[in-house]
A protein has these predicted regions:
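Catalytic-core signal marking the mid-to-C-terminal active-site face
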Residues: 494
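Active-site bordering "gate/hinge" segments
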Residues: 1-479, 489-490, 500-567
């Protein structure tokens, strides 16, 4: 018998997302992903100076702020053919790597972990046994019986008070929760420790960016960070050493806690290495430029089709015509006019709401395609592209997670299993581990270049008063490939479009009626209790949705009431 469930809104994400599923014999047979806000930021920046756009568009989201700012700056620099000083590139790279580290840690612990961890079960744990379980896989100094006892007492106090606070909402006791009490206790302890680690990542961003969220140091042509090692109120030696101290602390947590916890979750939920397979076409752009023209990068980019790593096609730069010409957005199933596929430079954002319809329009998110195909972007795509490109560091980081998984289970983990819900999470962890190397590398590069006497961080842009210029700023954001598309005419912005990662992944059916990545990933998912569809939420959360980026403007009521309807 067929059932219909609606989860509206999906919580523990950024923004507003509705998921509808049809369930046949306890398994999802069809799914619809609906963004329930409209983003009009593109309209706001029209007729403005292109140098102002980055400051405005980073307000698209309070989480992904840095990435939108940097992508917008790159778009303007692309349009105006500006060479960026390498010191500015190093500073931007450090900010991006720290921001992404923060984002990945927040996702795993605060947004996703509670889909796998039963908080109440931790009350039955033995703190000493929990500590013993981690010996041989982690040297983290807070994995002690004393620390786990403190955390357990905190949980007891919350339960006794009748107010669970941040742990108030969850499917505790759900039959799909499988972790032993000790592992649940470990996870809760690391959840709380991650809050402090996030602060260290944000300190790196704020020390260079002026503040976070919404950094202030970017400029079309570089960064507003004057360098003088002996000066005051500038980027001096003392501030650089302070930044380095936080970079080192981040690396310890990522390697000894985050990486281990990922392997532990996979070890106890191996069936989720076979569920959640999405679009299986993967797209990622090169990132962390080391030259002034965004032509040389530390991370490679590329495209993989139909889950076949041998189909890998490299994307070598942000001006790669193969990449630029392949991207279109359609609105056949979105609440906009102009339904046919459009290239972003010619894209329109004219709302046309006419109600929710299974076979018609049902989302404020557009549907992007790459040469007509639905693709997935994000850390899984990024990892698979780097594996296909033969990047040794990526393989090594993945091998480290697999080794822990193998030690816990006695089983190996193959690349084919990564096209899955847990594959998204593993890809994000691999990315975060690699980012620690990027932070160290780019910090050293900055110090070395300053030592050579190069203190340049900005070149003044020349914006012609007449003529039309097009630019695109690509960026590998925490959730995947981000692009801002800018058209400058007679010195001001005449058109602007942002094609964001969660648009690629949460998009509705495209112009050819092919389902989007979220929708495809849910098909075949078993649901034990339609009133508590934890399994559906697990897969959606594994993508780390940011609907505030994908769409933008709340409804008139502004109510945030979670409901699960079973029809």
């Amino acid at each position: 018998m067929s059932q219909r469930i609606t989860i509206d809104p999906v919580t523990r994400i950024e923004g507003h997302l509705r998921i509808d599923c049809e369930i046949e014999n306890g398994v999802v047979s069809k799914a619809w992903a609906s963004g329930t806000m409209w983003r009009g930021m593109e309209e706001i920046v029209k007729n403005r100076d292109p140098r102002d756009a980055w400051m405005i568009v980073q307000r698209i989201c309070g989480v992904c702020t840095t990435t939108h700012a940097l992508s917008s700056v790159r778009a303007a620099e692309s349009a105006l053919n500006i060479d960026v000083p390498v010191n500015a590139q190093y500073i931007r790279n450090i900010i991006l790597a720290a921001h992404t580290t923060h984002d990945h840690i927040v996702h795993f612990y605060q947004l996703s972990a509670l889909d796998w961890v039963d908080i109440t079960s931790a009350l039955q744990a033995d703190p000493t046994k929990a500590s013993e379980m981690l010996k041989g896989v982690s040297t983290w100094h807070l994995n002690s019986p004393e620390e786990f006892t403190k955390v357990q007492n905190k949980i007891k106090d919350l339960v006794a008070s009748g107010q669970l606070g941040i742990f108030a909402n969850g499917y505790w006791g759900h039959p799909a929760m499988k972790l032993p009490p000790e592992v649940n206790l470990i996870a809760v302890a690391h959840y709380l420790q991650a809050l402090e680690c996030q602060r260290d990542a944000n300190r790196v961003v704020a020390l260079l960016g002026g503040k976070t969220p919404h950094i202030q140091n970017l400029a079309v042509g570089g960064v507003a960070n004057p360098i003088n090692l002996d000066g005051l109120g500038v980027l001096n030696l003392e501030r650089l050493m302070y930044i380095k101290s936080f970079i080192d602390k981040l690396s310890d947590f990522v390697e000894q806690v985050y990486k281990v916890d990922t392997a532990v979750i996979a070890a106890f939920y191996p069936e989720w290495l076979t569920r959640g397979k999405g679009a299986v076409n993967y797209l990622s752009v090169p990132e962390f430029p080391t030259d002034s023209k965004n032509g040389s990068f530390l991370f490679p980019g590329g495209y993989i089709e139909n889950a076949d790593l041998s189909s890998y096609r490299p994307i070598t730069s942000h001006s790669d015509e193969y990449l630029i010409k392949g991207i279109q957005e359609s609105a056949k199933h979105s609440w906009y006019k102009d339904e046919a596929p459009q290239a972003p430079w010619e894209g329109t954002t004219i709302p046309a709401y006419d109600g929710w319809s299974d076979d018609g329009k049902y989302s404020w998110v557009k549907s992007p395609t790459f040469y007509g195909k639905t693709v997935e972007v994000g850390p899984l795509a990024n990892m698979l592209v780097k594996l296909a490109a033969g990047r040794e560091s990526t393989q090594n980081k993945l091998n480290e997670i697999v080794a822990i998984y193998q030690k816990l289970t006695g089983n190996t983990l193959e690349v084919a299993q990564l096209h899955s819900t847990l594959g998204h999470i593993i890809g994000r962890t691999v990315h975060c581990c690699e980012l620690q190397d990027i932070l160290q590398n780019q910090y050293s590069a900055l110090i070395t270049n300053i030592g050579k006497g190069d203190h340049t961080t900005f070149v003044k842009p020349n914006i012609p008063a007449t003529g039309e210029f097009k630019g695109v700023g690509f960026l590998e954001a925490p959730r995947g490939m981000l692009s801002h598309w800018m058209v400058i005419k007679d010195g001001i912005i005449s058109n602007y479009q942002a094609v964001v990662p969660s648009t690629w992944n949460s998009g509705p059916r495209n112009f050819n009626d092919d389902v989007g990545p979220y929708e495809q990933s849910l098909v075949g998912t078993p649901v034990a209790d339609p009133n508590k569809p934890l399994e559906v939420v697990r897969t959606i959360h594994s993508f780390d949705p940011c609907m505030a980026c994908a769409v933008h403007v709340v409804d008139a009521d502004g109510n945030e009431v979670v409901s699960v309807k079973v029809l």
